[in-house]
């Protein structure tokens, strides 16, 4: 086929794919599971039950009482009690050593003169007392310091006074109290003040916090010297909501002399890391597992109905509904085990994962729920699915997208159906929840929650996150059950349960169905990357045309590599590896064909761009370093996963700094974490660069990647 015909074919294929993505069939709504099974799961899901769990755990901003620290915490008690009530197998509390944490006992702030009135009380609202506040009983004059800059604090002569600020409570405390002699600090919460003037962020103060190296990055080497002095003891901090704080601010700015008395009682409490686990056993213990996760604790003294009591309640409801349907025979027993894990965010989840390496070794994927219960329209939010990165390619992305789409596209009225009785084809609404569309979005990867424990290089269990965003009451006193919605909770529990059950009970036929859907979605994703590539060329200049074209091709080439890796992941579901593998091979050929069509069309666009810029068409040629990189296929060693979550870090940290310095990489590697995950023995170094560049604004360089790989080789983590 000559070049002209290939370009015409490519453009025709792109048009067809574009129409497929844009024109949804208003008469067809499909699920990977048989529709009757999917609808049974949806019907059994109870958003009201999940909402009641949120209210039981976090009905208000409560003060954690001292007796709870002896264990178990109230949250733990409620989850384990319900699991046993629901009949889940293996329901137990698994505790690990914790440490000490601050606990506020009393916090009262009263104006003494010229008026007698209460300004703040921990009894009224727990976040009014800043965490970290020391036991105090002081009387002092108030001093207004504005945003709390060094100049404002200096001008206010704050020694012996209690400062009032609308800046950062912690930063102003450190400067005004610990350095300039102020008695304490009162902060006017500026957390979304124009949306909700009564909410306050969960704020804290302290005498300074130590710094540690990030993942894969060593902390500063210890030097033989006298230990540094202990940080100064913190004083105290109070918070006022904007509505009340503005009154105090205006009085102070008008020159009024105000004296207050602050009474604080606090103590340090020892605590344990409490995790709760349970499972629904599969019929084949060797077939693998699916694991749900949700952090039950957002710190020890901070609470939130949406963040993340809602995620904990939603996976509990997923556990209840699946166990009920399976025990009653309304769903077949799954082939694979479905496991559920609740714990402290990162800190507790990671301890359980490290302690259960045998389970992790056979776990296929993770579904993490974080902030899934909020009323979407009230928050102007979308229910997002955060996919894995290219470093953890997995079909769980497409399985979950299938149910997001089924609920999202089917649960809204379409003009094409206006004359029929079922104007909303797939109505998923809780009896006492919001009757509104399911606003959803399929997103690229985002971390910052417990799925990152599973995605870690030392664990390598691909994890996705379900999360609603934005959240107008995030990390504030306003994160209460009145912002939650039974309909949203029903949808979250049903989608998660359907996704997990699809994987848990997949046979060869369902594996083939998943592969077909993944390939279909993959053509659309490659098409999206093609648009990014076009825009890269559209925005280029004559002097950057060659580099832009190279980058543009990388967007498509990297996407093609990822889609084929994703298809390969499906083979773990198969019993007849040959038959399913052959089907997957055909789907990979489809992906290659789509990729080649895109690249042919991209070349045509490059040539048109070159004419527009008065340049000759670009001819791509590999540099000598790139040719070398194309022949190197790094492979990870057993040490990477031997000790589970973050266990590999000690080998990197153990390389002398002088040796590491010989291989600089920080300026030339967009994400060392992602680079690690892309090492699989099949990707060349050049492939790794393409996979990184295709999903990042910041571009990597071959030499930087080679340098980082050399460090990993010295650590015994990589062979090449």
Where are the language model's segments positioned?
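Noncatalytic luminal/extracellular "stalk/propeptide" segments of secretory-pathway proteins
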Residues: 22-39, 43, 47-48, 52-159
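Second-shell loop/turn segments in exported
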Residues: 37-44, 59-70, 144, 162-168, ...
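Long, charge-rich, low-complexity alpha-helical segments
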Residues: 667-720
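Metal-dependent peptidase/peptidase-like ectodomains
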Residues: 45, 212-218, 223-228, 237-238, ...
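Short helix-loop-beta-strand segments that form the rim/entrance of peptidase-like active sites
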Residues: 52, 207, 321-351, 359, ...
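Charged, amphipathic alpha-helical linkers/stalks
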Residues: 486-567
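Soluble metallo-hydrolase cores and metallopeptidase-like ectodomains found primarily
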Residues: 124-152, 213-305, 317-320, 324-333, ...
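Extracellular/luminal Protease-associated
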Residues: 22, 55, 67-72, 77, ...
